[in-house]
Amino acid sequence: MKLSGSSALLLLGFGLLGHASPLVHVQGKNCTVKPLGHGQDDVPNILHAVEKCGQTPGGRISLPAPYTYRINQRMTTHLESSTLEVGGMLLFSDDITYWVNNSYRIDFQNQSTAWRITGHDYVVDGGPERGGIDGNGQLWYTWAKGGSNVFGRPMPLHVLNSTRAVLRNIAIRQPQFWAVLVESSSHVELDNFYVNATNSDPNATEDTVWIQNTDGIDTYRSDHVTITNWVYEGGDDAVAFKPNSTNIHVENVTVYGGPGIAFGSLGQYPDRYDIVENITVKNANFQPSSQRAMNSGIYFKSWIGVNFGVPPNGGGNGHGYVRNVTVEDITFKDVQLPIYIDTCLSYLFDQNVTQYCDTSTFRFDDLHFRNISGNGLATPTNYTGRNITFAVSMICSKEAPCTDITFEDVDIKLPESYSGKSVLCENAGVQGLECNS
């Protein structure tokens, strides 16, 4: 039978994207994917390799260096007792309209994700050269123009419904939004990550440099998560413990720029009870980047106790607690607000929300800080509705005073020219530091 030219091309297209693709080499339990090139979408071939080798015990999918793989559509890779090697680079497409309209939605702050990894007993490994992700973030930074939580910006890596998972040796450059979200998962290890969000748009002049919302990693509804050996350079939280994050261990983290490590935000939704409990942060270093100031180091944030506005930037009157937290072996260099608690959170900056600063019922208890050194900049802030400066601020809500907060071997120097208060305490039971207020 003789095929017409158009029929032959059609069949060839099915061959490239279907099970007979010559760019997916299958040998037993091992699958290797080569990219199509020329901007063509590699997602179908990656998913085919995962189907063939990703759910078989001992299976292995390889996306080797030095190749770049185009991710032109959302994808879910389900792995069971297998390994995904990402030695190459996953480059997300620049089709903003597609991603805004088609990314996976999550039920927290109307956020979105682009690549979901689900399953159990799996490994995702970037290899010795740390392959990983290029989120094509610059176009998103310019598109959002410094707006907070602009709808539709997708997170490039979403660990979802996963148990006994290991992700290691991964670089994420120019994430579109938060780089990594671990959600509804348990016993997850994330080791040796590098995350960098850098803006090159000269129109960005404000303090955020348009790279806010480029968190390194957020945990949400997850238990027993280990985060070790991370380097983060960007414009937002390096690590953030979102609602119902329990038994989290963070160690050996270097942070360049942004707000630092956050416990929150919490208490945003009035119909939810948020718990953050059994958290350890050990051996973390904070300093400014070439683009972004180091706004804070370790901080805790809960929403106002009045449901004002709607998420992602409004809300409040949620309930819950942060309990059993240990923060130790911390170094600050030129950090504006080294350690503080904020119970007056809202992102409706043009509204008079500070009138609700003493309304939060969210509780912070059993917080312990030890072996902390470095310097703060005594930068003025008005997050409480007052103009204040400090090295440590434990200002808690009258409706939910903080209890059992201890400090041991803490030495945070402020500028010699600064003559104001260094330790602020209100509605807080603090031991180990002399409160000035």
From Swiss-Prot:
Identify the catalytic residues. Answer: 236
Q: Name the Pfam families on file.
A: Glyco_hydro_28
Give the protein's function.
Specific in hydrolyzing the terminal glycosidic bond of polygalacturonic acid and oligogalacturonates.
InterPro entries referenced in this protein's UniProt entry, alphabetically: Glyco_hydro_28, PbH1, Pectin_lyas_fold, Pectin_lyase_fold/virulence
Q: What biological-process GO terms show up in the record?
A: cell wall organization; pectin catabolic process
Q: Listed disulfide bonds for this chain?
A: 396-402
Q: Which first-to-last residue range defines the signal peptide? A: 1-20
Report the locations given in the UniProt record.
Secreted
Provide the E.C. number(s) assigned to this enzyme.
Answer: 3.2.1.67
Q: Which organism is it from?
A: Aspergillus oryzae (strain ATCC 42149 / RIB 40)
Which spans of this chain does UniProt mark as PbH1 repeats? 222-243, 245-265, 276-302, 322-343
* Principal EC category: hydrolase
The protein's gene is named rgxA
Q: Does the keyword Glycoprotein apply?
A: yes
Q: What is its main location?
A: secreted
Q: Which reaction does it catalyse?
A: [(1->4)-alpha-D-galacturonosyl](n) + H2O = alpha-D-galacturonate + [(1->4)-alpha-D-galacturonosyl](n-1)
UniProt keywords (A-Z) are: Carbohydrate metabolism, Cell wall biogenesis/degradation, Disulfide bond, Glycoprotein, Glycosidase, Hydrolase, Polysaccharide degradation, Repeat, Secreted, Signal
Q: Report which superkingdom the organism of origin falls in.
A: Eukaryota
Question: Is Secreted included in the keywords of this UniProt record?
Answer: yes
Write the protein's name: Putative galacturan 1,4-alpha-galacturonidase A
GO terms, molecular function: galacturan 1,4-alpha-galacturonidase activity; polygalacturonase activity
- Which GO cellular component terms, listed alphabetically, does the Swiss-Prot or TrEMBL entry include? extracellular region
Glycosylation site positions: 30, 101, 110, 161, 196, 203, 244, 252, 278, 324, 352, 371, 382, 387
UniProt similarity note? Belongs to the glycosyl hydrolase 28 family.
